Amino acid sequence: MNSIVNFSQQLIQNFQEVSQKTVADSSNLKAFAYLGAGLAMIGVIGVGAGQGYAAGKACDAIARNPEAQKQVFRVLVIGTAISETSSIYALLVALILIFVG
């Protein structure tokens, strides 16, 4: 049990030393903020591909059954709005990292 406590104390001490060195260099901090913003925007790729696929399938469904156009369109709009929220959150995270970080 004592070795676990010593390990955790050493881990905390090492983390504090590293974080103090990193915060002292603001150019590294800004570079990491830009890197994080870029990584946050990777999530938008999947949303765009998914929305394109859904729109294509909706066009196929309307072509096969034109009478169901209103129902297919309603489901498409709701599904697109729900899937778009994740890309909006990714954009907000990226903007916060760039301008606040």
From Swiss-Prot:
Source organism superkingdom: Bacteria
Transmembrane segments: 31-51, 81-101
Record bears the keyword S-adenosyl-L-methionine: no
Alphabetical list of PROSITE patterns matching this protein: ATPASE_C (PS00605)
Molecular function (Gene Ontology), one example: lipid binding
Cellular component, GO annotation: plasma membrane; proton-transporting ATP synthase complex; proton-transporting two-sector ATPase complex, proton-transporting domain
Family per similarity comment: Belongs to the ATPase C chain family.
HAMAP family: ATP_synth_c_bact
Entry protein name: ATP synthase subunit c
